[in-house]
């Protein structure tokens, strides 16, 4: 039936049509998260109860999933079990089919196209017969279709099972054969282009396991598949999975489990993993597959989800002979480099080192549950970013789950409780009846082969070579080289020289306000067309400074070995600790045992840019030939002894990308590494681009030469001698530059949530703005370029233009300064130019329409700067009278200001903005940092001069004004987030990212932390405050859903908004946010302002809001989610025209940041980050704040102008309101009057050729539905106790489905009494397993006690009261190391007490401000970013204690004498308890802990106090170094014995 040759040679683009995901959308537009777990009987006793327990566990994690637009079709639920042979035998009796359980029988679980059953089954049967497998029969799976949601029902496949048998193969060999069968079936369907391919999917084909899954809610799975509740359906294990997808169209194959794994999380490095897997395929050889290995290819598929591709990689390794544990260790390795637990197990480190040269990690937050039917296990990602709790029972069950309490276990039956830490694994071998912990698994796997010896034989570690100590060219030649390669004066002075001096990237402010590179009239180097992507919502960014233990820039170069080799041999290779190498190190690589060749990237200008493409293709041929000649290091070099006007360098990024993809296509990519020796690489963004498109290392020889010249400059030496620059020698200057680049690279990796350079390498995690398909397909295939742009000839022309400037007849003594960063007359156009600012100030200071018209004209007649400048309005309606248009009051209600924090801004500015917005009925945004409760009051004491005793520092006030920000922001630092703050908001904004620095945190310098700011932020004056890059309670989409739930819980009247930054794929993220119950989604553009950000982030991260807004609006509309949310946009909005254009693209509300500040008095000095703002807008210095002249009326006037302009445009279009034009894309057309300098290839289809969907406008606030707090509040005694401030005690049972308990009570108390005014006492006792966020935002006067256990986020944001958690009565553990609460507890707490008789998970007390707590063990990153409070840990601690901790104290009991190695000593120091005050503080907390929990550990310590006290360490940040508790000098008593 098959032409085997054709099948074997099936092109990848055809085989990608296979259903294994033919129905799946692009990997860039698919995200998911989930709840996952397994139950396994260690003794391999099969029973129906395990299946039922798995189904019940699924139901208990329903809140971790989501539903489609019909609110009934689940995103996916499923289970994997052993094959229920008894059920199948009885079911097939009527077909006279018999087989024994131990026979070599395989079962396939199939989704088939209902209208092509015969054809699809014939293909399956034909392949089985070709592989000499006997077809026993078919079984129609009994289902109940009526229980499905509408969308799931309409897309439901035909579900049937096939049974096959081998007469001569063992079960293990048959399992491998079935893998081959499935790949052949999929390949055949793909190559023949079956139009039903998207309806065909093989859930499982195995003789050990079977998968039941579909697009349904948890509770529906067992109702739909009748088998699952059949008493004969027995299994000794079950894996279960509930999916939360950002994409909402039902896709049955996307439900999990996959065939081997169930995955909760996201693989950030997917595109790179897929590229490298494709490049690895030619090397794959295996004794298992022999000459049939080609039939398994392609291994992965770019059209599949990350989970499906990870499953495919795992499946390959397992089917080729690896154990499941080893397969996951290879693909998802632990962060072994800084693991003290491996200090005495070098074989484990050797294993990971060995495979780091063969397989780049699949990196990202992930809990991966896996099975091959014999071993069931789970592993966690290297950062521990997903929860994983386990229970081992006395009757030999092992239960692992995303949450504790999903499977009911009697307390007396619990043997132990624990959690998986970062990179850890647990497995159950049901055939040998063993439970293996992390160390046992990894020791077993790694001791089989002497990996250390293999490394010693094959690996060379590149030693550091000294930097050059002399200049290599004179200043004239240097300037000519710099000019030829595109350097400007700003690149040298602001970037390279700053990095050489300070060893860090330059910081800038106020955002990017110049034209996009493709719109600019000035030439740009190729890197400027690339925008870095970043993590938001579906996975977290990482802090590369505070969590450096999981980060690495190491990379290995040379020929790669065969990943499937069962007797590993390692090719010769070199390990680089950094991809940034100097000239000496490059020479050392040439002198190594590897075969290296330098390939010149210069081309002759014979035909001008016309031969540009041919020259690049020739370069690619040269590269492949070099490999065929035996070279395994290719150095692409633009270095030339003499600069020649007729020899132009191919841009190194273009050269690298083209060669990289050419070698992949030729099957040669694994044979060699690409290095780059280039002059055109100096900023961190340049390095990131080169590495992202395949370069393993870069020698930036001209950047180093520039640093040498800077150091040699007499001016530099003079500044050093006067102490105005740090002193260094010429080699240190180059080392500083390299250090700055490396730090910047780590930040770029980490903003995407990637830890390892080897995972970023070749991952192409960029978005292109301004390159056409010809360029992209040649060198950057797989990268999105939404708007098209330069052709090869046009790119060649720009390259030549840059080069030719070096040979201009005009001679200058300085490099050209085009003003790309700082405004300069005659330079690049800046929207925020002095002329514009002056016109705006004149207009708003007195409401002067003439000046506003001038302002408006300046912006309307500007050069094309943003994408919207290429559009114009059209309407088929006749103009109407402006009197028919909605009132200006209605329009003003749609306006907001951006989230600018009090701390970054002065108090005067912040309050003036809020008052102005409240006057017009708009909304100001508090930003991060809290708000003074005095601002919640309405002013009624304003005198005739416009001042008020309540706010005496403000001018221009009126009675009735209020300075309260309507929008209160919740950012990653949680500074000032208290119950009272949250209750005084009309909206609560979760800031996921910021336009000017997406994927990054922030730091408010100590000089901006005045006593007033410190009071609001619950910290100490003068101490720097760090906002983490991620929210530590948002590592996935279901985590965001939980925070939205928390905020709806405390303030059910406030709308919840989620702020995202525009990037490719934002539409699917927004879909997840909408399904997570958000009320508002805000899309910020890349050009938003900021108080401080790395310059490379301002310039090279994020994309225009026009693209993001259009994508979000379209996708939500297409998936019937548009009516669930309001869309808001911000980023560079300045005129009424901007508002109308944004509305047409889908926006309903509009945010103003920079321009609002200008209207209020900002003069764009662009020194916000220095605390030296000359007009008092962005400073905390009192003498500068006194200069602030702004009044609310100025901003009111600005918005009146904007509102009137909107009304005029609406009238001219013939529309009566903004609502009437929202999403009406037909009103936009391309402005053909604009001719761009560089290209006519811009494509605006994503903005103008869109279906005009209709939807019901969303106005209400989403609710959480029935919650436990409402039941508690419904009890009269409770409501009376709140009203009368009396004391009451109540008792309740609790389950993991009861989330955020105690929070709504706290909101009511805070609303009525503030944070501290309640005098009553409400005691609530709970029994069972509490859901997430137990006691979140707890208010003073509420004491919660839990007899049981709790999940993540206990005490998050608590402000008062107490939380006590103890094991349930009757619990007897075999050891004292029991986990009782989850991850990220006490996050952002501003007060209160927490006592937990057991261990906590990762990131305990992260960003704690004032809470005090005692626990009996913690995971990694305890006390991270802590600014106050006291923490006591009476047990083991994980790694990285005290990272970023700037305040508060912590005490750790160190019985194992290993605590010192677990502390991050960058900021804190540790010491013994050396003062009486410190001893009393510690002892008092332990006494409280003993009294409240009955802790045996606490009682033992107190009884033997004198012997235990010397075993405690005190963790002390600098701000606490001179207080009674830490310093004998300040304490009346010291402890002599210590």
Swiss-Prot record:
Pathway, per record: Amino-acid biosynthesis; L-glutamate biosynthesis via GLT pathway; L-glutamate from 2-oxoglutarate and L-glutamine (ferredoxin route): step 1/1; Energy metabolism; nitrogen metabolism
PROSITE patterns, sorted: GATASE_TYPE_2
Localization annotation: Plastid, Chloroplast stroma
InterPro entries in the record: Aldolase_TIM, ET-N_metabolism_enzyme, GATase_2_dom, Glu_synth_asu_C, Glu_synth_asu_C_sf, Glu_synth_centr_N, Glu_synthdom, Ntn_hydrolases_N
GO biological process: ammonia assimilation cycle; L-glutamate biosynthetic process
Catalytic residue positions: 34
Gene Ontology molecular function, alphabetical: 3 iron, 4 sulfur cluster binding; glutamate synthase (ferredoxin) activity; metal ion binding
Gene Ontology CC, one term: chloroplast stroma
Binding site for FMN: 1109-1166
Family: Belongs to the glutamate synthase family.
Protein name: Ferredoxin-dependent glutamate synthase
Organism in which the protein naturally occurs: Pyropia yezoensis
Gene: gltB
